[in-house]
Amino acid sequence: MNAHAALTLYTDGACLGNPGPGGWAFALVPSDVPFLETGQXAPEAAAFTRSGSAYPSTNNRMELCAVINALQEAHGRAAEAVVVVTDSQYVRKGITQWIHTWKHNGWKTAAKQPVKNKDLWEALSALADALSVEWRWVKGHAGDPYNELCDRLATDAARRAAQSTADCP
């Protein structure tokens, strides 16, 4: 991965009820920002952040919206390589393992059921295919500074979701 082009994108989604009001957030951390230890508070000024909401939604749709919006931002910055850090195994395994089978099976699961959130998976796949992406999983609510920042921003967005317009389908 080209260190000069690499951005680290932390993402998170939240839903108050499932389904219910949902929020998503990402933090874009340039490669020149110093590493933060577990438990340190991530200064919002050290990262570019964005959040949005949808109502009604689900936690999985919000996780996907967070990554889609983060990758759109990376594309807008002409990034060639990114690291995506998510606490969602659904997103990480979906994009690195399951999606290949879904596409091969005509967007059906191994159980022959339609893939949920196909619209978002297709959007994510197109964005990810245009970049060099390294996918990392981090345990949620375990003190990772930027994961905690995204969690807070996504939860705040979910709280506002009932009064706002949707930022992601």
Swiss-Prot record:
PROSITE patterns: RNASE_H_1 (PS50879). Keywords: Cytoplasm, Endonuclease, Hydrolase, Magnesium, Metal-binding, Nuclease. It catalyses: Endonucleolytic cleavage to 5'-phosphomonoester. Residues 3-159 form the RNase H type-1 domain. Mg(2+) 1 binds at D12, E63, D87. Its cofactor is Mg(2+). InterPro entries: RNase_H, RNaseH-like_sf, RNaseH_domain, RNaseH_sf, RNaseHI. One of its GO terms (biological process) is DNA replication, removal of RNA primer. Its EC number is 3.1.26.4. GO terms for molecular function: magnesium ion binding; nucleic acid binding; RNA-DNA hybrid ribonuclease activity. Pfam families: RNase_H. It is found in: Cytoplasm. It comes from the Bacteria. One of its GO terms (cellular component) is cytoplasm. The keyword Magnesium applies. Its main location: cytoplasm. Mg(2+) 2 binds at D12, D151. CDD domains: RNase_HI_prokaryote_like (cd09278). It is an enzyme of class 3 (hydrolase). Binds 1 Mg(2+) ion per subunit. May bind a second metal ion at a regulatory site, or after substrate binding. HAMAP family: RNase_H (MF_00042). Endonuclease that specifically degrades the RNA of RNA-DNA hybrids. Monomer. This is Ribonuclease H. It comes from Treponema pallidum (strain Nichols).
